Amino acid sequence: MLDYHLHLWEHGPRTLEATLEQVAAYCEQAQAEGVVEIAITEHLHRFRQADAVLGGWWEAEPPSAVRDAMADFWNDEVGADLDRYVEVVLAAKDAGLPVVLGLEVDFYRGRMHDVAAILDGYPFDVLLGSVHWLGAWGFDGVGSDVVMAEWDARAVEDVWDAYADSIDELSDSGVCDVLAHPDLCKVAGRRPAVPDEWHARMAEAAARGGMSAEVNSNGWRKPAAEAYPAPDLLARFHAAGVPVTTATDAHRLDRVGERRGDVARLLVDAGYESVAGYRGRQRRAVPIAVAPTPTDGGPGGRVAV
């Protein structure tokens, strides 16, 4: 397996200092879990360089509880130095550790040219593109009363429409390589009765933009209760010729490589024979090797990818 979506820090206010020892520990944990390569992909919004350009973007939205919540979230998250982060991950890579330099880049409507300018000149291997926010509403914050009140106030079809519109613009921007947790709009467990039209739009957007799609195990930890993407969407990605990466979206060391066997089975069931790895933002195919590991416990056990 490749675990191509990993964060050094959990959410919330904390000391945001990247260290070589921390990256090395992630690599060691990955190898213990049978993960052959990882990508460190911290959130762009956690860095001061992004805050200098994008901070306050939510003020373009009408005053509301969700706008206030977004301001609080952003201010709690920011503080890391992008130059130091890049330096540390490159040092680990240069030392021969199985890691590539990445970043998770949120979608900012009408501002992706500003995002591209922030990223310009850094030697990233892979950039993940994510939609976590619809306007100032951080819809994936399912532990927040403010967020869930907004879910209650909106028709689920309208949420999925707005999400698909954002995916279209993100893909067409050409800024990112991989569509992270592609159907994150299901995070709260709320889906249209028949989501086919939205799945078709997501698959078409990824194919049109030349993006890979991420198969992300973190959905099993959410009310969605399944991986991102849903099996139907994964099948549509395969039919459209969209490559895939594999990921846990772990923010903690002990979740690196989590449920890799389940992810492998999803890939094989959808017809995939390889996953996408990246170097210098150039994609390469990494064959899927499906074989039980010594810790395989049968159904739901571990499978090598």
Identify what each model region corresponds to.
Residues M1-R109, V187-G189, A193, E197, ...:
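An N-terminally biased module of ancient metal coordination in phosphate/nucleic-acid-related enzymes
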